[in-house]
C-alpha cells in the first residue's frame, strides 16, 4: 500500500514522504491515527506544496533566529532579583525558565517562549551567576549569563 506520511513516524519517514507499507500496517495503524493518507496524484501534489512551504519557512526561521541570537547576546548578562533568598545564598524556591524569560524581556531582550530556555539544571536554587542557553532554532543557540541576586 502506498501512503504519504502526514507526521513523522519512527523508522519510516517524516511528513511528506511517500512510503510503501504492508496493507495491515497502513489500514490498522497509520490511517486511523492520521499519520498518513492514501497516495493519489492530488495528495502527492498537496504533499509537494507542503514540503516547499516548510522549506521556505525553515529559511525564514533561521534568519529570524540569527537576529534573535544577536539581540540576546548583546545583553551579555541579565540580572534577576529574587525576594526569597537565605543568608547563605540558597533560594527558598527556585528560578524557572519562565522567570528567566521575564528577566530577559525586562532587560530589553526579545519576547521568548519558556520552552526555548535551557537551564544548567532543572531549576536554579542559589544566588550567583549561572550560564543560560536559549534554543532559537535547531542550528542556532544563544548563550548568556543570568545573575541571580537576593532582593
UniProtKB/Swiss-Prot annotation:
Q: Which NCBIfam families does the entry mention?
A: L9
PROSITE patterns linked to this entry: RIBOSOMAL_L9 (PS00651)
What function does this protein fulfil?
Answer: Binds to the 23S rRNA.
Q: Which UniProt keywords apply?
A: Ribonucleoprotein, Ribosomal protein, RNA-binding, rRNA-binding
GO terms for biological process? translation
The answer to whether keyword Glycoprotein applies is: no
The record's GO molecular-function terms, alphabetically, read: rRNA binding; structural constituent of ribosome
**Transmembrane segments in this chain: where?**
none
Alphabetical GO CC annotations of the entry are: ribonucleoprotein complex; ribosome
Q: Does the keyword Mitochondrion apply?
A: no
For this entry, the protein name equals Large ribosomal subunit protein bL9
- Alphabetical list of SUPFAM superfamilies matching this protein: L9 N-domain-like, Ribosomal protein L9 C-domain
Amino acid at each position: 500500500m502506498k501512503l504519504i506520511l502526514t507526521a513523522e513516524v519512527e523508522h519510516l519517514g517524516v511528513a511528506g514522504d511517500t512510503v510503501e507499507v504492508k496493507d495491515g500496517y497502513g489500514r490498522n495503524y497509520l490511517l486511523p491515527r492520521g499519520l498518513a493518507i492514501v497516495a493519489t496524484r492530488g495528495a502527492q501534489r498537496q504533499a509537494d506544496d507542503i514540503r516547499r512551504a516548510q522549506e521556505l519557512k525553515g529559511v525564514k526561521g533561521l534568519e529570524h533566529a540569527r537576529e534573535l541570537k544577536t539581540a540576546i547576546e548583546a545583553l551579555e548578562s541579565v540580572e534577576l532579583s529574587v525576594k526569597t533568598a537565605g543568608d547563605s545564598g540558597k533560594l527558598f524556591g527556585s528560578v524557572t525558565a519562565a522567570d528567566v524569560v521575564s528577566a530577559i524581556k525586562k532587560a530589553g531582550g526579545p519576547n521568548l517562549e519558556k520552552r526555548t530556555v535551557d537551564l544548567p539544571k532543572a531549576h536554579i536554587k542559589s544566588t550567583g551567576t549561572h550560564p543560560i542557553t536559549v534554543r532559537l532554532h535547531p542550528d542556532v543557540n544563544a548563550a548568556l549569563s543570568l545573575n541571580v541576586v537576593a532582593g
